[in-house]
């Protein structure tokens, strides 16, 4: 029997006052999502949410990188391809191989044609240089290696891109994405690229860690959501799936949950959400700090400014997420970047 209290929560999420699912976007936002897709489960939900907002985003590609969890870079690539397939877009949205190693390990090899991460990095540069009046949003939700490499290889793209990164516990230490490649973050902080940080802040109500879904919510809302694909797709944990919604349930059932009630943060999805609707968080402009010995060092006189995002509206973001799983509008890249993938 379904819990009345849980049903009330779901109803509230789907009808929360002030949420505008159909927010007007005079032009679609060009975006490349950069992901360590096989690390836990928030990446997969970010990919699906992005791809189901085709009226908001022109998704030019999904690029991948390897972080410490989730196996080799090929496994991150396979998971991203799996989710794109489950969204019915595997013949339209490119999924490109990015960096396995770190920024400092690769930077000196950028003049070589086959450097680590070349497919993703060169594509980012190519799309940043495209003849389009809209600036390209780079949305890294893992380590910053691919983004830093693209900026280092061709600094002329800096005015053409906006980088919105999911990462850091700023002003505190730690955080998974940051720790996977600190030099790439410091490199970006020293450039003039437009740079925004969607904070994580483990255990705090002000970061994306507060944007959480419970297993009960997922089990009740997600089954069957999204387009039905054929043939079915084999999941990371086994099983065959024809919709992303069913795969979402599997991901939640096969991961450790935290808190009371047991839940999991959808960090990466929240970063996509605030690019869609900046009203769902608070933007705080600030002088760019730097990381030294694992600590944030403030530079109050630094003329270089960045934006910090905090105080994410969990109810609005989760309501829009669940709505888009039901009322999806599939994304599409510009015709020149579409391609059939195996």
Task: List where the protein language model places each region.
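Bacterial N-terminal signal peptides
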Residues: 7-17
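N-terminal acidic, glycine/proline-rich low-complexity segments
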Residues: 23-342
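Positively charged n-region of N-terminal signal peptides that target proteins for export
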Residues: 1-5
